[in-house]
A protein has these predicted regions:
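Extracellular glycan-interacting surfaces
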Residues: 1-343
């Protein structure tokens, strides 16, 4: 069975599919879900960060939920991740990021401690989120797939910072790293291979897509073929690290405001230029920027979710089709905040 978790503006949607038949349910109504994570070794454990209601967790694949953020100092949990390498008993080590920017670690899913060194970095006074310039937040957390001590954290906006020792000390943003990273992934089979979809390209075309082969030490920006430079989401084929899809728009408003939305999905294979993919996807106009995902157990398969519904590609992103899962009409006026797909 495939399970798809989607955080919308108002609630969490869970679609469960088997042999092409889908059932849909909703949870956490009114809690404003913002981010999601699934324990890779225990996929029935799901975590959801919210705006104003801290962190929630489920131990039964989303059927029931309980509060899990009592030790997190801030109400807005904007990023959550589970380490694929480090475990404490039955739990994967859990990280949660907040607004204002702070990073917390838990080894049991409930007791938290802040990794305070991140907030003391020299670049911290310059961090600022443009819609609310007085503050900023942790946008993404990426534990290393091979080294449990390595961790990358993206601040919106202002920095991509790293720790090589589990958060005890931190390396500040590098001179050539992205500053406004929206999604940061490490390929599950290629340690050190990072993909970053960033907003940097809005002001500096050519800097929206970033990739690193050495865990963030250095960066490359292959952008030939990209005509939309404000990048939001990225997913990599679990079976082929060189096949990638990204979602993009010309501006933040075109990405996120349903009434003015105009977004695109691009695909890149190997060293070929990016190509916009349209077959089976909704029209650009009126479609908010998609959140993309891949299921580690499905090589060659990608998923996309936007205000127009849930879409799947079974040919590595070339063609797409809308899933039969029910998509409430009210979602057309909302944005998708997060997407996770698992078995």
């Amino acid at each position: 069975m495939t399970r798809i978790y989607i955080a919308t503006d108002d609630e969490l949607l869970i679609a469960s599919g088997n042999n092409g038949l889908w059932t849909v349910g909703t949870r956490l109504a009114g809690l404003s879900p913002r981010c999601l994570a699934v324990d890779p070794l225990r996929p029935e454990r799901v975590y959801c960060g919210t705006a104003g209601h801290k962190l929630w967790h489920s131990a039964d694949a989303g059927a029931s939920w309980g509060a899990a953020g009592a030790g997190i100092a801030h109400a807005d949990v904007t990023a959550v991740a589970v380490s694929p390498r480090e475990r404490a008993g039955a739990f994967g080590v859990l990280y949660a990021g907040t607004e204002p920017s702070a990073l917390f670690r838990s080894e049991d899913g409930g007791a938290w401690r802040e990794l305070q060194g991140m907030r003391a970095l020299p670049s911290a006074p310059t961090w600022s989120y443009p819609p609310r310039p007085h503050t900023n937040h942790v946008r993404w957390i990426t534990p290393d797939v091979a080294d449990a001590a390595r961790l990358s954290v993206c601040i919106e906006a202002g920095a991509l910072v790293r720790s090589l020792n589990g958060g005890a000390t931190w390396l500040d943003r590098g001179p050539d790293g992205p500053l406004d990273t929206h999604t940061l992934l490490m390929h599950p089979r290629v340690p050190g291979q990072l993909y970053a979809a960033a907003g940097d390209g809005f002001d500096a075309p050519g800097r929206g897509y970033n990739e690193s082969r050495d865990g963030g030490e250095t960066w490359e920006r292959p952008d030939e073929g990209l005509e939309h430079h404000y990048l939001w989401s990225v997913a990599a084929d679990p079976g082929d690290a060189a096949t990638i899809v990204v979602s993009a728009a010309r501006s933040p408003e075109a990405a996120h405001a349903p009434r003015n939305a105009a977004s695109a999905v691009y695909r890149r294979a190997g060293h070929a230029p990016w190509q916009q993919v349209r077959d089976g996807l909704p029209p650009m106009e009126g479609t908010t920027v998609a959140v993309l995902a891949a299921n580690p157990s499905e090589p060659g398969v990608f998923y996309a979710a936007s205000n127009r519904g849930i879409y799947r590609s079974a040919d590595a992103g070339i063609t797409w089709g809308r899933l039969g899962a029910e998509w409430p009409a009210r979602y057309q006026d909302q944005r998708v905040e997060a997407l996770v797909v698992t078995d």
